[in-house]
């Protein structure tokens, strides 16, 4: 109800810490989470509303609360032309079936995103193994059991080198 239905936003409160014993009401609780959007203004709105709701809820119970933004990565914005050029390079090196374009982007949080506001960037994901290849592979990136197929790294290096050569050739 805070955002239009077609405005993508993910708010995850993934950590809640309070007290040390199950039978004692703690003096303090700390909730930590993440906000992921495609738009900096939407992120700012969500953070503001979290602060307002937190404050109102605490006051309703005669308490106090504060919201602190500890770190923030902006939404990633790929340069469309550079991203398409790198996708074509990947197709030339590895075949069309090896390339999957995420037209709508993803909701990942990435420090690299800060660079995308300073210069043209293309953020690429390199597949690093599937469960069909090996039962150890195919877990999500932030899973405690994740294992990557490191044999893919030369392909990633080849793509970056080839993409750089193409970029330089286009500018001669």
Per-range role (PLM):
Residues 1-172:
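Metal-dependent amide/peptide-bond hydrolase catalytic core
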